[in-house]
Amino acid sequence: MKKAIKLNLITLGLINTIGMTITQAQAEETLGQIDVVEKVISNDKKPFTEAKAKSTRENVFKETQTIDQVIRSIPGAFTQQDKGSGVVSVNIRGENGLGRVNTMVDGVTQTFYSTALDSGQSGGSSQFGAAIDPNFIAGVDVNKSNFSGASGINALAGSANFRTLGVNDVITDDKPFGIILKGMTGSNATKSNFMTMAAGRKWLDNGGYVGVVYGYSQREVSQDYRIGGGERLASLGQDILAKEKEAYFRNAGYILNPEGQWTPDLSKKHWSCNKPDYQKNGDCSYYRIGSAAKTRREILQELLTNGKKPKDIEKLQKGNDGIEETDKSFERNKDQYSVAPIEPGSLQSRSRSHLLKFEYGDDHQNLGAQLRTLDNKIGSRKIENRNYQVNYNFNNNSYLDLNLMAAHNIGKTIYPKGGFFAGWQVADKLITKNVANIVDINNSHTFLLPKEIDLKTTLGFNYFTNEYSKNRFPEELSLFYNDASHDQGLYSHSKRGRYSGTKSLLPQRSVILQPSGKQKFKTVYFDTALSKGIYHLNYSVNFTHYAFNGEYVGYENTAGQQINEPILHKSGHKKAFNHSATLSAELSDYFMPFFTYSRTHRMPNIQEMFFSQVSNAGVNTALKPEQSDTYQLGFNTYKKGLFTQDDVLGVKLVGYRSFIKNYIHNVYGVWWRDGMPTWAESNGFKYTIAHQNYKPIVKKSGVELEINYDMGRFFANVSYAYQRTNQPTNYADASPRPNNASQEDILKQGYGLSRVSMLPKDYGRLELGTRWFDQKLTLGLAARYYGKSKRATIEEEYINGSRFKKNTLRRENYYAVKKTEDIKKQPIILDLHVSYEPIKDLIIKAEVQNLLDKRYVDPLDAGNDAASQRYYSSLNNSIECAQDSSACGGSDKTVLYNFARGRTYILSLNYKF
């Protein structure tokens, strides 16, 4: 295999030299000059002419919709919504994260790993994504499964590239300078959103230009919004709390009287036996003994004999087991009943962003340099991102089209002292850091072969390093850590709550928050494009060498010496060979079919190999790379002048099937590989959460449709996606509440490590609009549809042929993930917008989002699977008890209250001058 790979790479390199000779030989056979009239196609229409599963969205910075909604309007693309992450996390065909989706900004892979602190009842969650301000995004291109160039490096399902605004986006026509102003505000907790960008450009004598652009953006995002129907998200579940409180008071011997006051429940014997007229021949002797019984007799004397109201009886209100004390007791324990999905105050976001670019361009070369910053404060946590990038292109002839790119990205998350993660308090300031460096160089050649065959080749090399580190090892965020500052009193030592243990019994170090380590990718890639008339063949191939070095905790227990838990490192390397081939034909404007086959790989991440709930229990560097084989069949339609002279129709229909081997997911089960350590055996620590390769092949199939029609006066956009999959879940997709869990549940805490990523069964968007008064006035209506989707439950599903047996003397080995349940299809959501352009490039836009004020749930929102959607109920009725005796006296319940925004009015202004 190694010899074959080496031979392929050498052969691909020689094609460049051979092609030059062929081209020179054909030069003298040129018969005459051929005049070619190129079609001028706008960026948003180009995907309808390209033989690939690609979609584009332009002018994102002008949008009043969120960046999540923009991405979700693309068929086959979605986002993992997380109100606390501060990043844009793109999902392609149910795959998400570093290596599954190559998310880029201006062609630079984004590696930031965001981990949020706890929000209300929910534990923090983690996800990869791009830390970018949507106000700076000119457009986004999404490629699904097929690839070319550097975008195919470590990209299992595809890539998404966010393009930022440049000099020529800001300056109109040949003017020397330009300014863009954007402002947005609205109702329903829509906070301020402002951006300004200024650019200057000077034309040079050689026909080139030099320019500079600077932009500033500030945004605030509040989650304290009202859902459909007008109720605030944070207040959801008050009805459940009220019922549980009533049940709590009933158990304590109180009921509500007609005036809404708590009063003694005279049907309870401890009250009825102390009435002034109690029946002395009844079974009351036990209930009339002691000081508490005496107090009850005094209370009932005032209530029944003297006719006082309950609120005026001091002993009833302030007694040891009176109403005030019962109320305080409920308040201390009400967390177990709360189902509010988030605590809005902990997710208030305030961001400030800067963009500075320098550009030079002429007929033969282009040079660009940029600095981009983002500072985002989410609750008490801060995110800081700094991105530096240089691009250079030199194009002298058909043999020399050289591109060079270098980038340096730094991302930091600052956790304050006193913050909570998984219910555990951060003891001191904690800073996690991500540093990525990328260098990419490639050269393209264009040849004219015999038989009027055009050949274009690109040969490139990419070097990419990515490192995760922390300013200190957070020992307090460990499963068995024993420290007075984390002691929860009796709660710690009972069967409920946090584990703790001495060093002589249990390891004190875990790696659950931001595992540290370094990745290196070295990739050689080669693209070829053959064209003859209406037929085209594209083939892209790359070879990647991947090396890693990660940090984990050791455990040394030597007789006669103190137990040592050193920080150790483990390294390794893996290889992958990826290729993508597309055959297409331009049979007519109405029918341009294409067929694509691609084989792609994804390397295991540091977070998967070195996450460990305790000591080195979860470390698994033997993970195999994921491998996907995808077949796509589709066609394009691009027709100008269909019904009128200038109308344009674009259609793209794609069907696909994917087969993924060695799918990586986290599993709860047996963890040791070289024999069970003594500390684990003596404490019964047989199971933990670790990452594994899924044994069955993951299969996906689906259809994606995109239609665009524009005739000036009328326009329509349609997108629709359908998918079937047997994609497995993770064990960490849903976890018990970190601050209200039993010790058994704490062992199964997933720390927000993963979330369900399967796409809804189907989803789509339809937009219809019309333009009037020389296209100055635009009216539009958009309808969003989400079909049946999934969320993880707290219940276990056993895999690899294993099963769990209760009450056995010796537990068998088993492996578990989380079951899912369906989220029913959501109501159709309508958004109405009106925009007016009184003068050129001044656009005033008014929008009503969720026009009909529907109550709906956004699929793939982290809050859907949050622990706060599960609570303990004591309200089981007699039917439940009759069916299952274990349900008597209370049981776990689940709800889905993580609703999206209700009706919201938006007003925005965009001015370019």
Curated annotation (Swiss-Prot):
List the record's Gene Ontology CC terms alphabetically: cell outer membrane
Q: Which family does it belong to?
A: Belongs to the TonB-dependent receptor family.
Motif residue range(s): TonB C-terminal box: 896-913
Extract the InterPro entries matched here.
Plug_dom (IPR012910), Plug_dom_sf (IPR037066), TonB-dep_rcpt-like (IPR039426), TonB-dep_rcpt_b-brl (IPR000531), TonB_rcpt_b-brl_sf (IPR036942)
Q: Which GO terms describe its biological process?
A: siderophore transmembrane transport
Per UniProt, residues of the TBDR beta-barrel domain are 176-913
Subcellular localization? Cell outer membrane
Domain (TBDR plug): give its ranges: 42-165
Which PANTHER family has this protein been placed in?
A: TONB-DEPENDENT OUTER MEMBRANE RECEPTOR (PTHR30069), TONB-DEPENDENT RECEPTOR HI_1217-RELATED (PTHR30069:SF50)
| Protein's membrane topology | Multi-pass membrane protein
What is the predominant subcellular site recorded for this chain? membrane
Q: Which UniProt keywords apply?
A: Cell outer membrane, Membrane, Receptor, Signal, TonB box, Transmembrane, Transmembrane beta strand, Transport
Protein name as catalogued: Probable TonB-dependent receptor HI_1217
User: What is the organism field in this record?
Assistant: Haemophilus influenzae (strain ATCC 51907 / DSM 11121 / KW20 / Rd)
- The residues the entry assigns to the signal sequence are 1-27
- Role noted for this protein: Probable receptor, TonB-dependent.
This entry's Gene Ontology molecular function terms read: siderophore uptake transmembrane transporter activity
